[in-house]
Amino acid sequence: MRSAALAVAITVLLTSCSSSDPVAQQPQQSTPVQPTCSNTEADQGSAWIKGQLEAFTNEDPETAYSFASESFKAGSNLEQFIAIIVSNYGFLLSTSSYTIGDCTKQDELFLFDVEVTDIAEQKYSMKYTLSKIAGNWGVDAASVTVGEDEPLYS
């Protein structure tokens, strides 16, 4: 019942936020990607992604939103965030497993390869973009990497 109520609420929100494009929110920078993040950066960023993915699986949009970066929150409120997830990333709400792969650093951003498997065993390759500002991690963007080079998973 909670799922149905959440889905209805989110669907209503979609009509007012359908012009939001999460891919367009990703920073467009041409700085070359450095080979890897430090072990600490990879561990901390992975823990942040894991927390958000678990919140989605537990149908807890408020907690999932709390993992977003301050810059993301400045541009999208909770209702818009829910609309983005439902319209573009509904599979996150039915995740059965996930693997967090390689981390690369680009300027002040951390790019993580993530593979999500939903309850129907469909796999989704994703790229998560995180920032760490004044010691605080945040998810800036996430996108499905359909048609791109397959990321490496450890």
Which stretches of residues belong to each language-model region?
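Short, low-complexity N-terminal intrinsically disordered segments enriched in polar/charged residues
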Residues: 19-58
